[in-house]
Amino acid sequence: MNWLNSEAFVLFDQHIIWSDMVGNILGLITLALGFRRSLWTWPVQFLSGLVLFGAFYGHLTGSAGKQAVVMAVALYGWYQWNRGTDKAADGKVSVRFATWAERGAMIAAAAVGTVAVALLFKAYPSLSWDPWPDAYIFVGTIVAMYAQARGMVEFWFAWLLVDLVGVPLNFANGYAFSGFVYVIYGALVLWGMRDWWLRSRRDSRPVLEGAPA
């Protein structure tokens, strides 16, 4: 899969390689499918991870390892949405707000995970080009995917927090194309957040006996 590491084009003085372009496109498709609560969200997410794993394997083992974790969480998400019993009236996953206990657990996991992963990255510099923000984005992505798999509206808030670091970080390091992709991510996140928020309120309303759902 050497072609994945070859240059696709140059934009904003940034050399875009095929794996970045394909990965970013699949990432945008994943968010759009997630907004619609489509089961295809997870196969596309898995494919995105697989493409990047193939691009990184052999010379960037740390990046390949991160994509392996993403693929594992994508399989979990597919299982949850496909086999889960908590379905909305349309047969898709039912969305809800997390409980305070769930929120606390996710915040704690994100904090501890970020510190642990950042220390790992610092101990092995070849795993990351910028340990702390890279760890924050990686762990935040995993937490967001977990919340999405459980149908939690907070999934969108987690993605927004990732974007708040990802956008300025990419622009500051000269990755304008990647930064603009994160801006598009942010727009999709706000759109999806509004939809899931309103849907969670509808799904939580009790249906009167004999009334159409």
UniProtKB/Swiss-Prot annotation:
What's an example GO cellular component term for this entry? plasma membrane
Hydrolase listed as a keyword: no
Q: Where is this protein localized, as stated in its record? A: Cell membrane
- Gene Ontology molecular function, alphabetical: nicotinamide riboside transmembrane transporter activity
Keyword annotations of the record: Cell membrane, Membrane, Transmembrane, Transmembrane helix, Transport
User: How is this protein situated with respect to the membrane?
Assistant: Multi-pass membrane protein
What is the superkingdom listed in this entry's lineage? Bacteria
- Could you list the residue ranges that cross the membrane? 15-35, 38-58, 107-129, 136-158, 171-193
Instruction: Please describe how this protein is used in biotechnology or industry, per its UniProt record.
Output: Introduction of ribM into a high performance B.subtilis riboflavin production strain may improve riboflavin production process.
Known NCBIfam families for this protein?
Answer: NMN_trans_PnuC
Tell me which family the UniProt entry assigns to this protein. Belongs to the nicotinamide ribonucleoside (NR) uptake permease (TC 4.B.1) family.
Write out the function statement from the record. Transports riboflavin and roseoflavin. Can also transport FMN and FAD. May confer roseoflavin resistance to S.davawensis, which naturally produces this antibiotic during stationary growth phase.
Protein name, entry field: Riboflavin/roseoflavin transporter RibM
Species this chain originates from: Streptomyces davaonensis (strain DSM 101723 / JCM 4913 / KCC S-0913 / 768)
UniProt lists the gene as: ribM
